[in-house]
Amino acid sequence: MSTAESRNHYKEVPTIEHYSEAIGITNRKKMDWRGWLRKSTLVRSQLIRGCMAEFLAVFVLMVFIEGSAATAIFTNRRQDILFGSISSGLGVAMAVYVAGGVSGAFLNPAVALAFAVLGKLSWKNCIFYMISQYLAAFVASCTMFAYLYEALNNFDGGERQMFGPNGTAHIWSTYPQPFLSPHTAFADQVFCTAILLIVVLAMCDSKNWKPHNGFLPIAIGLLIITISCTLSYNAGAAMNPSRDLAPRFFSYLAGYGTEPFGVKGYTWFFVPVLGSHCGAIIGGAIYQLFIGGQWPDDTSDTNSVSSMSYNEDNSTLTKRKQVSNIVHDSKGAKGSSTAPVN
């Protein structure tokens, strides 16, 4: 056989790919535009995915908060605390649903800081999440200003005012009551955020009565409604620095001048930021001192009887654990294929 004939012979020898294609078996899948788009936009960095989730969730949160505040002002419902509280609480719940499965949905720089201090969140993630949250709040404020632009002009005649009958500053940020002193305002922000963290940590504690993940956003939303209904009279209960500071910067750019920062002689604008961070750390420390750090070492199994018997004395606890072990052993024996048959 010549060299040329040998080459043609080997070219015509069927390969395994030929047989696979002949019987319809192939590992090559045709990628449609959806698969191509997903592959092209897939982010493999867990940190970046978390930042993206925080950004989108805070954006959604701010749309609901600022939208509800604008609706209250435009419809003369400024004093309707329940309306604003329910809107804010449900907005938080929806935002937690958006990012809960990706980043944990911190939504709040103060909450992220408290979790980092307690060792529940890495400092790297904390810093980048905080940046994402501030950016999202600013972008959401820009978006809502464009969305509400004609309504704002219809309401105030195109002249941006802070307070009074045509004042719209409360759409963007929180402001204290005229009678509130600076030190009381600071204590107010610390107290509100501390309460927030105590309950949030309780809800996220697997050794406590943690709600199911699917219900957790609703529970957190109910918490926000409760705090807003009870602790918002003094200064609006911001509890979230990104929700307050970023829109305040935007309102400065949107025609309100320096007044958003000049309230109370420039002693207010930093209070919701500093007070919220301090309150979050204090609230986290209080929960760890009273609850989180007091769990016995043998309560890792949250479904066991012993974890539900935390307040019992040691002897009773031991007896209940023995009963629990006997029950588990008997169930295991019945379900085992090697168990003796009587």
Curated annotation (Swiss-Prot):
Region (Disordered): 302-342
Topology of this chain in the membrane: Multi-pass membrane protein
Main location: membrane
List of glycosylated residues: 166, 314
SUPFAM superfamilies named among the record's database cross-references: Aquaporin-like (SSF81338)
Biased amino acid composition, Polar residues: 302-327
Motif mapping: NPA 2: 240-242
GO CC list: basolateral plasma membrane
Induction: Transcript abundance is low but expression is slightly up-regulated in the inactive stage (during anhydrobiois).
Superkingdom per UniProt: Eukaryota
Record localization: Cell membrane
TM helices/strands, residue ranges: 55-75, 98-118, 126-146, 184-204, 215-235, 266-286
Keyword flag Transmembrane: yes
Sorted UniProt keywords: Cell membrane, Glycoprotein, Membrane, Repeat, Stress response, Transmembrane, Transmembrane helix, Transport
GO molecular function terms attached to this record: glycerol channel activity; water channel activity
Chain ranges for the short sequence motif NPA 1 as given in the UniProt record: 108-110
Tagged with keyword tRNA processing: no
Comment block on domains: Aquaporins contain two tandem repeats each containing three membrane-spanning domains and a pore-forming loop with the signature motif Asn-Pro-Ala (NPA).
Function of the protein: Aquaglyceroporin that may modulate the water content and osmolytes during anhydrobiosis.
Similarity section: Belongs to the MIP/aquaporin (TC 1.A.8) family.
Protein name: Aquaporin-8
Organism, scientific name: Milnesium tardigradum
Gene coding for it: AQP8
